[in-house]
Amino acid sequence: MNTSFLIHANQALAFDDFLSYMEIPSLVLDFVSETPDSLHWYFHREGTSTTLFSINYNLQETYEVSIDNLASYDDLKFFPYLVDSLSKFLNGTLDIDHIYEELNEDWIEETIADEVAYLKATLTILPKYFLAQPMDDLAYVSLDTLAPFGVNLHSSTPRIYGYMQYLMRRRALPCLKDWDSSVQG
């Protein structure tokens, strides 16, 4: 799952100009996706991110900024700044004045706890839990992925989250394309 915020603006986003405005050299654009009625930018912070951020523009003056709920702790802390900066870049002012109050340390803890609980619930009935915005195509976690680390459904939330981050940082989660090739023989 992911968390997202809407920003209303009456101008198109020039993503390269936004990156310059942010003055964060570690921000890297991974790819842009375009449909007839929307634009999507996917990016990460080099050396910090374990999942992708996204900005989605529906071509009707609304931007949706989102982050995967299993993102790194540092990215979850960075997320309100990203929303604030995009709003100021597009509108010259903060469109969401409660962003820092809402997305605080308590929100980070609740987001991680809720997402790990969702992961546990999913893995009790399904063999794979797919990340919402992975760095690699269709990355997922399974009980088999966690077992070598002594992690299972009864492990604590910090332990599960910690090993998930370890695997994601090393880009060691299996991907659906890996699974498909092993099934096809």
Question: Which residue stretches match the model-derived regions?
Answer:
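Aromatic/basic-lined ligand-recognition segments
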Residues: 108-185
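Short, extreme N-terminal segment that most often corresponds to the first beta-strand
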Residues: 1-35, 127-147
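Short, intrinsically disordered low-complexity segments
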Residues: 22-74
